Amino acid sequence: MPLLEFEPLQEGVLIKRYKRFLADIELSNGEVVTAHCANTGPMTGVLIPGQRVRLRHAPSPKRKLAWTWEQAEVPGADGQPCWAGINTALPNRLIRATIEAGCLSEQLGAISNIRAEVAYGTNRRSRIDLLLTPGESNPDQRLIYLEVKNTTWTDGTTALFPDTVTERGQKHLIELMGVLPEARAVLVPCLSRPDVMDFAPGDEADPRYGSLFRDALEAGVEVLPCCFRYQSNEISWQGLRPLKKFQNL
């Protein structure tokens, strides 16, 4: 089921990514362009010089770069290549579209309003990705604080987050636990590749995040790993994925 549709992306080959935000890409006509890379992390397992990539051309006087790197072709869990979404600015919009399409109605119940980037937490210095107001028919009338995490790192068919130490991610888990029990707290790993079958915390990359993740589950934070397929002109819903059984740290 397509959730986001857009003009077909252009394909190229990744030459290199550098200074975190920049990537040199050779287009099919041989032209080399510099594209914005919104993903500032290590991009473990999805950053492969020479790989096929897809990028969006959107020149504007307000933008320094006319190109944005959107997708990367990566080795899939079944040995076949698949496409991963690497633009970390996109998942919030994608998850909002998922909710509005009713894909999570069984888990969240009826929703009457969605607000983005709402201040909350300690001294209201954090911002929740999405704040959901339940509809009248929802049996649970608590507000829903929903945090989204783009997830592309894998171990076999298991999606893992994070792929590096993330103090920001640790803080988000603490803040989510802080809204309980007066509100619901939901963590949504946005599984931005179609070849994954379950989700687990990236203990190897960030043991403290893994420990806080377990604390959050015990405290009542809900985790809804949402899987998507990325194509050149659309992103489609692939369904929820379960949590993998994992040991306590």
Curated annotation (Swiss-Prot):
Q: Which organism is it from?
A: Synechococcus sp. (strain CC9902)
According to the UniProt entry, its GO molecular function terms are:
DNA binding
Report the superkingdom from the record.
Answer: Bacteria
Q: Which Gene3D superfamilies match?
A: 2.40.50.580, 3.40.1350.60
| Similarity comment: family membership | Belongs to the SfsA family.
InterPro entries in the cross-refs: SfsA, SfsA_C, SfsA_N
Its name, as the record gives it, is: Sugar fermentation stimulation protein homolog
